[in-house]
Amino acid sequence: MAYSFTEKKRIRKSFAKRATVHQVPFLLATQIESYTQFLQAETPPARRKSEGLQAAFNAIFPISSHNGLARMEFVSYHLSNPPFDVKECQQRGLTFHSALRAKVRLIINDRENPGKVKEVKEQEVYMGEIPLMTSTGSFVINGTERVIVSQLHRSPGVFFEHDKGKTHSSGKLLFSARIIPYRGSWLDFEFDPKDILYFRVDRRRKMPVTILLKSIGLTPEQILAHFFVFDNFTLQSEGAQLEFVPERLRGEVARFDIVDKNGRVVVEKDKRINAKHIRDLDSAGTKLISVPEDYLLGRVLAKNIIDPDTGEVIANANDELTETLLENLREAGVKDIQTLYTNDLDQGPYISQTLRADDTADQTAARIAIYRMMRPGEPPTEDAVEALFQRLFYSEESYDLSRVGRMKVNSRLSRPSGEGSMVLQDEDILETIKILVNLRNGKGEVDDIDHLGNRRVRCVGELAENQFRAGLSRVERAVKERLGQAETENLMPHDLINSKPISSAIREFFGSSQLSQFMDQTNPLSEITHKRRVSALGPGGLTRERAGFEVRDVHPTHYGRVCPIETPEGPNIGLINSLALYARLNEYGFLETPYRKVENSKLTDQVDYLSAIEEGKYVVAQANATVDAEGNLIDELVSAREGSERETRMVTPDRVQYIDVAPSQIVSAAASLVPFLEHDDANRALMGANMQRQAVPCLRPDKPLVGTGIERTVAVDSGTAVQATRGGVVDYVDAMRVVIRVNDDEAVAGEVGVDIYNLIKYTRSNQNTNINQRPMVKVGDIVARGDVIADGASTDLGELALGQNMLVAFMPWNGYNFEDSILISERVVAEDRYTSIHIEELSVVARDTKLGPEEITRDISNLAEAQLARLDESGITYIGAEVEAGDVLVGKVTPKGETQLTPEEKLLRAIFGEKASDVKDTSLRVPSGMSGIVIDVQVFTREGVTRDKRAQSIIDDELKRYRLDLNDQLRIVEGDAFQRLERMLLDKTVNGGPKKLAKGAKLTREYLADLDKYHWFDIRPADEEVAAQLEAVKEAIEQKRHEFDLAFEEKRKKLTQGDELPPGVIKMVKVYLAVKRRLQPGDKMAGRHGNKGVVSKIVPIEDMPYMADGTPADIVLNPLGVPSRMNVGQILETHLGWAARGLGQRIGDMLKASAKAQELRPLLAQIYNESGKAEDLDSLSDAEVLELAGNLKKGVPFATPVFDGAHEAEIRRMLDLAYPDDIAKERGLTASKQQVTLHDGRTGEAFERPVTLGVMHMLKLHHLVDDKMHARSTGPYSLVTQQPLGGKAQFGGQRFGEMEVWALEAYGASYVLQEMLTVKSDDVNGRTKVYENIVKGEHSIDAGMPESFNVLVKEIRSLGIDIDLDRY
């Protein structure tokens, strides 16, 4: 097995029993692929598929004018390069976008001869700006990173369901069908309690379904022929002869004696006809049965009956037979009649009854009835009626089933799936009604709307395409109106097209749609989870309030597609889900999951992705089925899922067709990071998965000792850890960047063979956490493509590291861990284990006001020099300044309105020229409760305003950094070129050269070394081919230099041009503060198993419980938090973590004793290769083994994959390996080595019982007490009620509500109560008086009238009731 550059530094020992045949796919693939397909920017115009932007243009163009003389055609589009890169957009508050330009052709036909083209104008037209996706699947909109969440919505198609008996009091099932298009009117069909079938369009008034059938051109005869089979009768003078159809009589009660053709009575009257009777009649060759007259009465005619002589209609189709009608028929000489065959069991007369309820006569009347329902009150003219009917379901402009919808309709109506148009067809309506009638007749099954075959995912690309199409259709309307003038006014395409509607539609979607969300950037996992989220909410989806239990519940088809664990707690539970680890979308937007093919009970290496619909056809076994070395299923019975319900049952191995690819395929990325998930209760697992997303990155990330093996995948796929895009040798490393000289075989001809990775340093995330990347390579390291070369936030050696590994004891400690509280050792704080850096952005803008411009300056009156000490001459704080609440960060003055001055003041001002009172101090200060260090300052200046020194120095630094990058590239390019030149020139004969090189001399290495490299080009080789190559290299180097100079110039232009600022803003300054947050009581912590708590006390290290060798515990947790919560995974993690720490200490002791690699190998082989997945340690060199051992000193990392993890026996074996008997005895371990005798840190006495002690990965969550704690003495008041505002953000007070008033009343504390309701709240005069009294030293209160009484009086007055208050 080949290990990557980073993997071999610290190999994670895996307990997995099953080898993976299918790697976890790239976790951001759904987002990135969807948007790539939408843009198709890299695809040449001729080869673009009709999807995304191309499909939108194709759908709207060509646009023709109303008179048909002019039309505009779409040729192609292209996206320009973005003006700023992602980082610049974030700094400047811009959108990372690209300009979309479409090439359109305006064709004008000749007026006299419309078939002849008069003029063609082709032009490229600006069509707005399209936001671009970053490499990590997010968007930068107005400087902030956002994510477009995928939407899980009901797939277009046809669906059949019933009301579950809830509508009618009798509990009768009322069946309904619904045809849902992607775009256009919904068509519903529904039965009422009287079994009449209705239809409605867009949930409007219902009408009998036969009106719709007539409107599509069917006559009542044709309608009946479609839905019924007929009984054929031949009328006799008395009674009639019925054509014998055996299956129609079975189960009926004979209303008369049934005789065969020989006259023998086969069935007596009032006897039920059974199978034997049918056989007897059949064997007797019975073709006709004589029936009495009353058997015909009440039957319904299937066809119109016309008098053959006169042509007069005697009876209409759907008429009931009566005695009179029968008489008339006989008189007219009608012999053969057809009636509808109906029964109460499986052939109901529903359509016949509906036809009776329908009073429309023909197609025209039916269409008018539909028009009146859709447009009540409007006169139904013939054209309007026809236009509306066509537009409802048959017009491609207003109705679109989409490929998905057509496929779903065809598959449900049992037709070939790919055929049919994207609008409704008459057969679709007919077949739908047929299936619905069959359902009512008890044939067939209704659909499950929560089945993932009926719900599809709309990804970013599709959502953006819909918005773009909406904007483009608005443009189409405007263009249509103006096209008529194109010829007369000689207009060009750009005169006709206004891109604003497109821009505004796109901007609205990306900026304020419910699915465009502020990216959760707390840590790499929260980023990746946010991008893999699937929401049922949003436009065209469900609403929280209306979503029932069924939609939220876990469905069997979620298996391997949607995670059953990870979903929010609260009102959104089950509506927001996460994609499972291996899930992907198919071309129709349905979720698929991979399964491994099984043939003849043997596993193959073929992996097929199946959608929920396809999976229903197969028998799929679980990944934990027992398999022998050859891949054969060896159990007699295997647990497998089969049938459309996907019920788990035991089947024989020969019936198995597929097997899961991995045990973890059922869960999402976050849930798969929880070790021993299989031992946790689902509710707690949900909390564990959710809380990992809230973990704050620590100062020094620490990989989890007990992981699941997915940590590396998440860290790399999130883009937090930097990967090498091409292999090569590390040429230069510092904290800011890594320079790699690319391998020759990976370098592209004509490109620079250098990759420069500028690392992100101390950057603020959306949640104010710190993003910082640290290089992991040194100069000379050889890296391959995909190797991790730098760690990011919460990653350690390329693995996700959300928390810290802590020595945890499960025991009570003086009540300080009551109710899930957590007791922490002072050592944890002293070692900065949970210290995190948070970056706050504070900004100030200088505006142009009516009274004059605001000014950013150091010159502020009435401020002491000490307060200005941290400002430079431009009035902006310097980097590195330590600031506290209230300190000035940026000095700013605002002009004040001129006040009316007295003559004396005017005189003084004239004499002393004092203008300070004209401006007021509006400087940016550090908000209350915040302190930190200034780590960055950015100054943005409007175009045309001169820059201050600070802004100029920032630009100079940026240019210096950029020049450094270019110089590095040039250095490596030239180095490579001169190496090649040296190989080429050595031992070549020359015609002359610098330093008096004689003709005919041969070039030596010494001569070339002595000569300045740039003078090599002055050598004149005798071989013309070598001379030509020398000249080519010279030109190539000069070309590169020229390119780099151009790039530098472009960068300089970009930096020195004015910044785009909001209207009225002259200058903007952003100051970034780094705030260090140490762990303190009140902070929330959690494990990965939903075991959360709040830090209650930080205890001195000497008071913590300690082991026999003196090692104190880091954290003490309450053991009572485990049994009732049923998250036993945390205990198993603790035991395995304890073994990991012990093994690390054994390796550390050996290294201390200067052990050689050969001595370490046997122990490493025991650890890695006794059970679980074997590791190829022999492939490592001795130096690599020693480096590996050095990284294992703090603990050997384990991987216990979800549902395929370590067993108890393996944990015990690892504990035995980590703690041989001598070490165990020395540390006070019990015989099982899972518990320890601990001593009380305060008394030194041993505790009565052994305690479970081990290592657990604990996280510090983003709920920090510093962000929540808040106190107010005085502050702002509400304008109307004059009561203090509420909330920390407003520096508000604590609400003293109704119940608190009751409490004071109950205690009789009348003065306290009076004070609370008046001077401490909204008694304006009283407040000022109290303040005055305190200043004077008088401690008395004069309570007045609270302002809220005045508000109440005013509100009552607004109702027209006058109230006066008298004071007594």
UniProtKB/Swiss-Prot annotation:
Keywords: DNA-directed RNA polymerase, Nucleotidyltransferase, Transcription, Transferase. Gene3D superfamilies: 2.40.50.100, 2.40.50.150, 3.90.1100.10, DNA-directed RNA polymerase, beta subunit, external 1 domain, DNA-directed RNA polymerase, subunit 2, domain 6, RNA polymerase alpha subunit dimerisation domain, RNA polymerase Rpb2, domain 2. SUPFAM superfamilies: beta and beta-prime subunits of DNA dependent RNA-polymerase (SSF64484). Disulfide bonds: none annotated. InterPro entries: DNA-dir_RNA_pol_bsu_ext_1_sf (IPR042107), DNA-dir_RNA_pol_bsu_external_1 (IPR019462), DNA-dir_RNA_pol_su2 (IPR015712), DNA-dir_RNAP_su2_dom (IPR007120), DNA-dir_RNAP_su2_hyb_sf (IPR037033), RNA_pol_bsu_bac (IPR010243), RNA_pol_bsu_CS (IPR007121), RNA_pol_bsu_protrusion (IPR007644). One of its GO terms (cellular component) is DNA-directed RNA polymerase complex. It catalyses: RNA(n) + a ribonucleoside 5'-triphosphate = RNA(n+1) + diphosphate. The keyword Nucleotidyltransferase applies. HAMAP family: RNApol_bact_RpoB. DNA-dependent RNA polymerase catalyzes the transcription of DNA into RNA using the four ribonucleoside triphosphates as substrates. This is DNA-directed RNA polymerase subunit beta. It comes from Cupriavidus metallidurans (strain ATCC 43123 / DSM 2839 / NBRC 102507 / CH34).
